[in-house]
């Protein structure tokens, strides 16, 4: 929790003094916050906490005109993947998604750009799922 949730809480607390109406906060959660994962219980728990923090903060800051949203990536290729998994798991990474592949970082980035833009001026408390078609509730 120290890394994944406390850091967001304290960073947000420090940044709020400098934010004006029209500002946007975008947090990163994960598909595991919605699906769970028996091997990543600690990680899934922190990502679920980020989701709840995002929604609660959005309701808290709406009257100040500050939007708060999240992005929940699914399996995305990063240097962490080959460093964390054995070769067999790396070869199959993302293949269980409806699109049958893992995403690339450049496929996630536009979600952040959208949420930061004025095109999302009426969007707050929401989470965009960039996960190759895995439909999750919540």
Residue locations for each model-derived region?
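Alpha-helical segment proximal to the catalytic Tyr-Lys
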Residues: 17-18, 59-63, 121
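Residue(s) in the substrate-gating loop at a strand-loop-helix junction
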Residues: 30
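Active-site loop immediately N-terminal to the catalytic Tyr-X3-Lys motif
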Residues: 35-41, 63-64, 100, 118
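Short C-terminal tail/terminal secondary-structure segment
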Residues: 35, 112-113, 124-138
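Active-site helix of classical SDR
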Residues: 12, 46, 54
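Catalytic Tyr-X3-Lys loop
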Residues: 1-9, 26, 50, 99
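Short, flexible catalytic-loop segment of classical short-chain dehydrogenase/reductase
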Residues: 34, 51, 72-83
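A conserved structural motif in NAD(P)-dependent oxidoreductases
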Residues: 97-108
